Amino acid sequence: SGGEPTARKDLEELVNHASKIGLYTNLITSGVLINENRLKKLYDAGLDHVQVSIQDTDPNNSEKIAGFKGHQKKIETCGLIRKVGLPLTVNAVMHRQNLHNLKNMIELAVELDAERLEVAQVQYYGWALKNQTAFLPTREQLDKATIIVEEARI
């Protein structure tokens, strides 16, 4: 809802300043506009952490939910984040259209060497509020998801 921060040309400068004054810096990104060189520059500027949003483990459904093709780029970016030495969180907004892939999402986060998987729910405002029936999980989906999460807890 706040826009893609990697579109900013001065992002490294902002990260550097924030780091110098003692702030924790966390880049929340779609992961599609960034490359290894930029990640290295952000790391050198003092970036502490990166969070990448992945809509689903199924590329077609992921791109349908996101509204653009970029699933493979997101996966590649996660690998680059780890390669440059930054901690990674995978952010997965789970809902009726992708909750059936929750176990796969957990497995993907492990495969990507993510420190964390943030399982979030849809923020019901604006378009999502008007179309909430397309997102609200069924009781059966929630019950299954609860079991999956409990089994995966470390």
Regions found by a protein language model. Name each.
Residues 1-59:
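Conserved SAM/AdoMet-binding glycine-rich loop
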